[in-house]
């Protein structure tokens, strides 16, 4: 369990008219049948669209999750643009799949992958584990280091036991790759256009995303440093595949190759 939200978080949610979420409520949402999840996601999408007067976009990676999200959004609002960041690291099949879609804005990072790893270090395992390893190897806070090694009082937020040997790796490790190559291009696009993102991430993907989802009261994040909407944030991986099959939505062929 993630524990209760702080009093300040609850008060902030009340003041902005937002939803207050806890771990049990998230689990309840995650256990709903798909048809109800679709209805809730559609409502969150409408709320976001109306709040920003239609100045929105879908963050589109070509992966199955963002493919489902794009399909749901465009069933409601066909003219919403999709935005794809071409990092140069994508499978050729992903690039071909993205090109099949209309109204997609292509962005590029200002720094290539080689330069990123030279400057910041290698992304390993996952973004979350890379961040934890980075903070252990480079951080100055002993309190944070202890959490990353042993976990918080709920046992969360630590490097997995199987990856602790990487603490002594001879090469630098960092989570900065995603920030430089993916997040920065999106941030520039948002600043230039004023458009706010729908993002196809799910709380079930990592403990950090679960914490973010709960802390911010659900799908639509209005008070974070980067405002964003996670309309399928309470879905599970099985829901994605069920949606693709039920609605016969084409998805990238890399998934049929075992990736």
Regions found by a protein language model. Give the residues of each.
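N-terminal amphipathic/basic-hydrophobic helices that include classical n-h-c signal peptides
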Residues: 1-20
């Amino acid at each position: 369990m993630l524990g209760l939200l702080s009093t300040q978080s609850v008060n902030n949610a009340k003041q902005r008219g937002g939803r207050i979420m806890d771990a049990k409520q998230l689990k309840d949402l995650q256990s709903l049948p798909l048809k109800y999840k679709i209805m809730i996601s559609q409502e969150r999408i409408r709320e976001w669209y109306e709040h920003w007067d239609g100045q929105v976009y879908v963050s589109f990676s070509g992966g199955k999750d963002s493919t489902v999200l794009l399909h749901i959004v465009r069933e409601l609002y066909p003219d919403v643009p999709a935005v794809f960041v071409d990092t140069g690291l994508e499978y050729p099949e992903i690039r071909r799949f993205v090109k099949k879609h209309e109204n997609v804005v292509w962005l590029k990072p200002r720094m290539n992958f080689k330069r990123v790893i030279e400057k910041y270090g290698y992304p390993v395992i996952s973004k979350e584990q890379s961040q934890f390893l980075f903070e252990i190897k480079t951080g100055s806070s002993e309190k944070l280091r202890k959490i990353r090694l042993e976990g918080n009082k709920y046992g969360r937020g630590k490097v997995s036991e199987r990856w602790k040997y990487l603490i002594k790796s001879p090469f630098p490790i960092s989570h900065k790759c995603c920030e430089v190559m993916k997040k920065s291009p999106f941030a520039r696009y948002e600043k230039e256009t004023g458009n706010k993102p729908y993002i196809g991430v799910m709380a079930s993907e990592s403990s950090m995303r679960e914490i973010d989802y709960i802390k911010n009261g659900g799908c639509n994040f209005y008070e974070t440093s980067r405002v964003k909407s996670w309309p399928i944030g309470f879905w599970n991986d099985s829901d994605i595949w069920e949606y693709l099959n039920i609605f016969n939505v084409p998805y990238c062929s890399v998934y049929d190759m075992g990736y």
